[in-house]
């Protein structure tokens, strides 16, 4: 092999020369052997990642993976948390199409990076939507809002902020809760504990257990609260119960962290679904709110969300925002522009906003209709048990009370897919598919699986 000689005019040249002499010190075959023995080379050696095991599918998203592999013409996917039309098709809201067309027609729009905090107009409008335009926190500039990557991203940013800057590192989440919650907060650096919420015996709220567990929590602990349409149970506290929860939490200095993934999607009213949050803000205390526009605007794939932190003063809110930027910058630098722009167009335009509320109400009403139809279908079949929880629960999901063995039976024999805890997405049902689901539930219950 030919040797290349460098002059010693610089330390850089000397280092390069030393490296080449090292490479040339052995035979060509030795060098090639050394090269191919390197674990990161393109040779025939094993991968440095060969020790990895195959990770299981996500328990929720994996339902759709299994569904897609099933060739059955009668298969039914009730696992995914996404709205479907009566024909079982994904829905893009008309108001979203109109907003997008406005954006397309605006030739002045550019695709530059957003600030770290996101689209400022979107942030202001999101705060007004969740807290109310007349909120004292907004009026007094005691709130900071940053655009995040849908609900998951909002929770993660909030979790990391609390892990870095809040004196308590423990967060209490409901038992049960959305499967991603414990992972989000654990990886954010918080210690996750649970508080009682659902009563399997009544298929309703275990309110006494909830109060006891929050009452026993260490002062200052963080408490994750589902603002409405609890996932996965569909069981929400009454306004009177929310008031008791608020008083208890404020008396112990517990920090409320609201997950608002379904505003307007639960009752059909944006204001009704935001009432628990507004109760906490009205007392002058501090709290965090994670918002998502995946469900209520159907912007699942646009990943549009916001994190709002209500503070005691405008000065503190400004400092909080400065620290949120330091959390976001190394995580994803700045959020996407398109989805937030769609939301901003709809929220700022009175006509589009009104049209959105009508479409939102129509989606909520269809889900309520599916609940009634399923309940009536089970009653008509004489299915053993009390199924009234189906019409008492609220929002996208119903916690059926079916166990994993029963779920497995329904998947195998009836090609119905849902999470193993028996949660079904009512938004995935239609008038045509309700009888098939009712037949499957009736069969699995009467067979005592």
From Swiss-Prot:
GO terms for biological process: 2-oxoglutarate metabolic process; aspartate metabolic process; biosynthetic process; glutamate metabolic process; leaf senescence. Belongs to the class-I pyridoxal-phosphate-dependent aminotransferase family. Its EC number is 2.6.1.1. Its main location: plastid. Induction: By ethylene and dark. It catalyses: L-aspartate + 2-oxoglutarate = oxaloacetate + L-glutamate. It comes from the Eukaryota. GO terms for cellular component: chloroplast; cytosol; peroxisome; plasma membrane; plastid. It comes from Arabidopsis thaliana (Mouse-ear cress). PANTHER family: ASPARTATE AMINOTRANSFERASE, ASPARTATE AMINOTRANSFERASE 3, CHLOROPLASTIC. The modification N6-(pyridoxal phosphate)lysine is found at residue 295. L-aspartate binds at residues 81, 178, 231, 423. This is Aspartate aminotransferase 3, chloroplastic. PROSITE patterns: AA_TRANSFER_CLASS_1 (PS00105). Gene3D superfamilies: Aspartate Aminotransferase, domain 1 (3.90.1150.10), Type I PLP-dependent aspartate aminotransferase-like (Major domain) (3.40.640.10). Expressed in roots, cauline leaves, flowers, hypocotyl epidermis and root hair cells. Homodimer. GO terms for molecular function: L-aspartate:2-oxoglutarate aminotransferase activity; pyridoxal phosphate binding. Keywords: Aminotransferase, Chloroplast, Plastid, Pyridoxal phosphate, Transferase, Transit peptide. The lineage of its organism: Eukaryota, Viridiplantae, Streptophyta, Embryophyta, Tracheophyta. Residues 1-43 form a transit peptide. In eukaryotes there are cytoplasmic, mitochondrial and chloroplastic isozymes. Its cofactor is pyridoxal 5'-phosphate. It is found in: Plastid, Chloroplast. Amino acid aminotransferase important for the metabolism of amino acids and Krebs-cycle related organic acids. No activity with D-Asp or D-Ala as amino donors. In plants, it is involved in nitrogen metabolism and in aspects of carbon and energy metabolism.
């Amino acid at each position: 092999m030919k040797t290349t000689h460098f002059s010693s005019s610089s330390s850089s040249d000397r280092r390069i020369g030393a490296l080449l002499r090292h490479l040339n010190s052995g035979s060509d075959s030795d060098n090639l052997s050394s090269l191919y023995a390197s674990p990161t080379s393109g040779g025939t050696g094993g991968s440095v990642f060969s020790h990895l095991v195959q990770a299981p599918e996500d328990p929720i998203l994996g339902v759709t993976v299994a569904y897609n592999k099933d060739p059955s013409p009668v298969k039914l996917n009730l696992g995914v948390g996404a709205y479907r039309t009566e024909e079982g098709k994904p829905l893009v809201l008309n108001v979203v199409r109109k907003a997008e067309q406005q954006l397309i027609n605006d030739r002045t729009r550019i695709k530059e990076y957003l600030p770290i905090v996101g689209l400022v107009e979107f942030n202001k409008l999101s705060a007004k939507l969740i807290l109310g335009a007349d909120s004292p926190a907004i009026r007094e500039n005691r709130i900071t809002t940053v655009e995040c990557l849908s609900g998951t991203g909002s929770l993660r940013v909030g979790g990391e902020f609390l892990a870095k800057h809040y004196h308590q590192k423990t967060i209490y989440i409901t038992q049960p809760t959305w499967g991603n919650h414990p992972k989000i907060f654990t990886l954010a650096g918080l210690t996750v504990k649970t508080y009682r919420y659902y009563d399997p015996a009544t298929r309703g709220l275990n309110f006494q257990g909830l109060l006891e567990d929050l009452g026993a929590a260490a002062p200052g602990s963080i408490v994750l609260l589902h603002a409405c349409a609890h996932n996965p149970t569909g069981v929400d506290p009454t306004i009177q119960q929310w008031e008791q929860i608020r008083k208890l939490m404020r008396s112990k200095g517990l920090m409320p962290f609201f997950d608002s993934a379904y505003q307007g999607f639960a009752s059909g009213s944006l204001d009704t679904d935001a009432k628990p949050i507004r109760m906490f803000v009205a007392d002058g205390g501090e709290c965090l709110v994670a918002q998502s526009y995946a469900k209520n605007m159907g912007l699942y794939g646009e990943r549009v969300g916001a994190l709002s932190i209500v503070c005691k003063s405008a000065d503190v809110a400004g400092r909080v925002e400065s620290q949120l930027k330091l959390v976001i910058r190394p995580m994803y630098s700045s959020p996407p522009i398109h989805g937030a722009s769609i939301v901003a167009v709809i929220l700022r335009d009175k006509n589009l906003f009104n049209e959105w509320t009508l479409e939102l109400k129509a989606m909520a009403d269809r889900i309520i209709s599916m609940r009634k139809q399923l309940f009536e279908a089970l009653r008509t079949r004489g299915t053993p048990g009390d199924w009234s929880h189906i019409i008492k629960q609220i929002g996208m999901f119903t916690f059926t009370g079916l166990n994993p063995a029963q779920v497995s039976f329904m998947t195998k024999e009836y090609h119905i897919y849902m999470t193993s805890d028996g949660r079904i997405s009512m938004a995935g049902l239609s008038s045509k598919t309700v009888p098939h689901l009712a037949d499957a539930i009736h069969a699995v219950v009467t067979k005592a699986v």
